[in-house]
């Protein structure tokens, strides 16, 4: 049930009846719930457009919709608001439908093919905290769009091609390590040494470039080593994905190497279409849409003098593939803000070349950085980048210490399980609860707190409801009486449950998981107020008990579904 959209449509229909069209009513939750659960916020603006006084326009709108069953009362308040108090009986009817629905009453939408480009680690390097935001924010979007019925194509655009592989293959050859057992940790060490050697040893650099050319030309020996490096890396990355409880699998890997064979044809095609030109041995696209420091069209190099290709070339090919082969209707990129201009340029070139439709939805969902308390990039004490595995290890250890203090008699197996769920969940929620467009301060104490907008607080709210339901000893099949709402805290909780669909739909458009975190926190606090003000297990009447149990079940289901969409697990006891 999308209450905001329902109210908005009622207002639009009322405006059409009084000959006011092309207006966009802004509906918000009302903080003063005694006069209205929702309110029209831009009445004054609409009144100015229609040359009516706000009070006069409000009366006309109210007159046209006040008889609808879903509204208990519609009122005007100064200086220019319309307040909508929802009928408790109507709310109860909607809750009954949701109670019987395995999808919490949320319908499927018209399906699109949506490619989500996220995570994207590099080969021969361990994942670090810089990969966290892209991985978990992108995964929330994938889960939500999946739930709504879209065909979601997860694209883990790994960096599995380029000069670094020539360096690494050459180094493994020189050190006679090709047939040795290799771990990802060792590969990263060898890569760092290979890079240093490449910068100071001209012969080694030439050998590295030779291997790059051989690899690009399909040399079987180089290809077999490359494949081994990719396999070792992705095996470890998939372990991280499993620990993070994200839905990325090995089958979702779509590395840069996929598009390698397309690149020569794209260069020729762009030259034939007069989009690209050769200058000083390089192939360049000059874009008037972008200006350099001198105010001239910016040049985008798509092939170097040595005939090597660049990231821009790969991204143009990638766009073509996703549109023409995967038939994407919408492509969403989860990379940091530094990639924004680069992506815009690739999109512009692909459109000029007619590789993609002008109507293809292209979105770059940028995100900020994770900072330490001193507001600097979050690193180890030695100044090194923190490995993602180390971060998750510490989260689990910290959660374990907290749980031991609260439940010292837990079995080792249960302790490990709980520590993992709560620790990893806390890290994810701390990130997801922040607006992705901003940087945020990483704080262990805050994220593992059982108070405030944190994963442990939401998880605990769920376990408390599970405990209440267990104490009731009332099977769900016996809860046949209708939900009825009399107290304000019951109605406010019910309204909050009904809000879930509009939150999910909003995130599906904006890609902003912090909105869902905020909603779940408010849902949990609404339940807490309900619990404090309404006896659930021991009211005067049995039908009141059953009604409140159903309301509790709906709250638990919504909390669980919301956390699931965030990729965070629940527990039945904490």
Curated annotation (Swiss-Prot):
Pfam families: Arg_tRNA_synt_N, DALR_1, tRNA-synt_1d. Monomer. SUPFAM superfamilies: Anticodon-binding domain of a subclass of class I aminoacyl-tRNA synthetases, Arginyl-tRNA synthetase (ArgRS), N-terminal 'additional' domain, Nucleotidylyl transferase. Signal peptide: none annotated. NCBIfam families: argS. A motif ('HIGH' region) lies at residues 121-131. This is Arginine--tRNA ligase. One of its GO terms (molecular function) is arginine-tRNA ligase activity. InterPro entries: aa-tRNA-synth_I_CS, Arg-tRNA-ligase, Arg-tRNA-synth_N, Arg-tRNA-synth_N_sf, ArgRS_core, DALR_anticod-bd, Rossmann-like_a/b/a_fold, tRNAsynth_Ia_anticodon-bd. Belongs to the class-I aminoacyl-tRNA synthetase family. The gene is argS. Keywords: Aminoacyl-tRNA synthetase, ATP-binding, Cytoplasm, Ligase, Nucleotide-binding, Protein biosynthesis. The keyword Coiled coil does not apply. One of its GO terms (cellular component) is cytoplasm. Its EC number is 6.1.1.19. It is found in: Cytoplasm. It catalyses: tRNA(Arg) + L-arginine + ATP = L-arginyl-tRNA(Arg) + AMP + diphosphate. GO terms for biological process: arginyl-tRNA aminoacylation.
């Amino acid at each position: 049930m999308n209450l905001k959209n329902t109210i908005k449509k009622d207002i639009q229909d009322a405006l059409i009846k009084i000959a006011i069209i092309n207006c966009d009513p802004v509906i918000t939750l009302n903080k003063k719930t005694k006069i209205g659960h929702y309110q029209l916020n831009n009445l004054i603006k609409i009144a100015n457009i229609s040359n009516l006084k706000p009070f006069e326009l409000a009366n006309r709108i109210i007159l046209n919709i006040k008889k609808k069953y879903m509204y208990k009362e519609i009122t005007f308040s100064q200086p220019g608001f319309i307040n909508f108090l929802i009928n408790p009986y109507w709310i109860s009817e909607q809750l009954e439908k949701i109670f019987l629905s395995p999808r919490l009453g949320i319908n499927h939408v018209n399906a699109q093919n949506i490619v989500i480009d996220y995570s994207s680690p590099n080969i021969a390097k361990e994942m670090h905290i810089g990969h966290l935001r892209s991985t978990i924010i992108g995964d929330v979007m994938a889960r939500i769009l999946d739930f709504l019925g879209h065909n979601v194509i997860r694209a883990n655009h790994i960096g599995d091609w380029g000069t670094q592989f020539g360096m690494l293959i050459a180094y493994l050859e020189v050190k006679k390590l090709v047939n040795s057992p290799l771990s990802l940790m060792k590969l990263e060490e060898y890569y760092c040494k290979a890079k240093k050697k490449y910068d100071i040893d001209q012969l080694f650099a030439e050998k590295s470039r030779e291997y790059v050319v051989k690899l690009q030309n399909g040399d079987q020996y180089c290809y077999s080593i490359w494949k081994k490096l990719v396999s070792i890396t992705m095996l470890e990355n998939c372990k991280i994905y499993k620990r993070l409880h994200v839905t990325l699998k090995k089958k979702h890997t779509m590395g840069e190497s996929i598009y390698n064979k397309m690149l020569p044809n794209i260069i020729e095609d762009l030259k034939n279409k007069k989009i690209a030109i050769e200058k000083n041995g390089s192939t360049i696209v000059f874009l008037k849409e972008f200006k350099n420091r001198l105010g001239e069209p910016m040049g985008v190099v798509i092939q170097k003098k040595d005939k090597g290709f660049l990231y821009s070339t790969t991204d143009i090919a990638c766009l073509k593939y996703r549109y023409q082969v995967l038939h994407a209707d919408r492509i969403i990129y989860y990379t940091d803000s530094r990639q924004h201009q680069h992506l815009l340029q690739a999109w512009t070139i692909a459109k000029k070349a007619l590789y993609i439709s002008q109507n293809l939805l292209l979105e770059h969902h940028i995100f900020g950085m994770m900072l330490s308390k001193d507001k600097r990039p979050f690193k180890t004490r030695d100044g090194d980048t923190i490995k993602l595995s180390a971060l998750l290890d510490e989260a689990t250890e910290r959660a374990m210490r907290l749980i031991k203090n609260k439940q010292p008699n837990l079995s080792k197996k249960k302790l490990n399980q709980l520590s993992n769920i709560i620790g990893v969940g806390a890290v994810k929620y701390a990130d997801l609860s922040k607006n992705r467009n901003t940087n945020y301060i990483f704080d262990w104490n805050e994220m593992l707190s059982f108070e405030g907008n944190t994963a442990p607080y939401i998880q605990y709210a769920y376990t408390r409801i599970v405990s209440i339901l267990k104490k009731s000893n009332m099977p769900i099949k016996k809860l046949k009486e209708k939900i009825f709402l009399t107290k304000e805290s019951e109605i406010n909780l019910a309204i909050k449950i009904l809000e879930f669909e509009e939150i999910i739909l909003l995130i599906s458009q904006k890609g902003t998981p912090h909105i869902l975190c905020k909603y779940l926190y408010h849902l949990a606090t609404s339940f807490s107020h309900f619990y404090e003000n309404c006896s659930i297990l021991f009211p005067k009447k049995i039908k009141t008990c059953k009604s409140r149990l159903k309301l509790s079940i709906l709250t638990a289901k919504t909390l669980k579904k919301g956390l699931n969409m965030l990729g965070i697990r629940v527990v039945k006891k904490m």
